[in-house]
Amino acid sequence: YDKIVDAAWRNGEPGIVFIDRLNRDNVVPSQGRIESTNPCGEQPLLPYEACNLGSINLACFFVPGHEHDEDPAAAGIDWDGLKQVVHLAVRFLDNVIDASRFPLERIDETVRRNRKIGLGVMGFADLLFQLGIPYDSEAGIALAERIMGFINAEGHAASARLAEERGPFPAYAESVFPQRGEGPYRNATVTTIAPTGTLSIIGGCSSGVEPLFALCFTRNI
């Protein structure tokens, strides 16, 4: 274990996945066991399954002038705008499933049966800078929970609305959601947070929910 930790500290490898833990949260166990994740590890997947990912740049929702408020995030974040973008993004990612073409018929069938999407965020560290909240603070942790709780709730609300329009994902009746009294949803999964190493460069923001690794740096693409 010490060697694994030391190697991860030095170069970021190896990544560790506890597959039994992932399967305890498998929302469609009737469709099979989770065997692996996508390359970056944020999206657990069944055999022959794919998931469309998208990330919201949180820094775009900063509202200046509230950095010295007792709760700078209350008025310092455009929550209404964020809600609109979450609902739009869920609809867009669901559309991508229908527009996608896959190399194997089995992949196509699995993807369309579960209709998994993964909406996440980037620019979190930038937003904290804008709000004047230290990344390594209790306030920073609380804001992370607050934002992702909001996105998760609104994302599932958007998926439920799509289920009313287009029908739930085909495996919904065999999923864990009816037992929990949840849904129906259009998508088996809605959120996931990717590291966004490339997307954040395109968006000109910090990656995922990670802190900036330096105050000044140059990245060659």
Give residue ranges: language-model regions.
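Conserved, charged catalytic cores of large soluble enzymes
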Residues: 1-32, 66-72, 121-177
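Short beta-strand scaffold segments in enzyme catalytic cores
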Residues: 16, 191-192, 201
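A generic hydrophobic-helix recognition signal that picks specific residues
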Residues: 3-5, 40, 189-190
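Function-dense linear segments that define catalytic or interfacial modules
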Residues: 8-111, 116, 123-131, 205, ...
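Catalytic phosphate/nucleotide-handling subdomain of diverse soluble enzymes
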Residues: 131, 143, 148-155, 200-221
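Internal maturation/activation junctions in enzymes
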Residues: 85-108, 112, 133-196
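Short solvent-exposed loop/turn micro-motifs enriched in small/polar/acidic residues
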Residues: 1, 37, 183-186
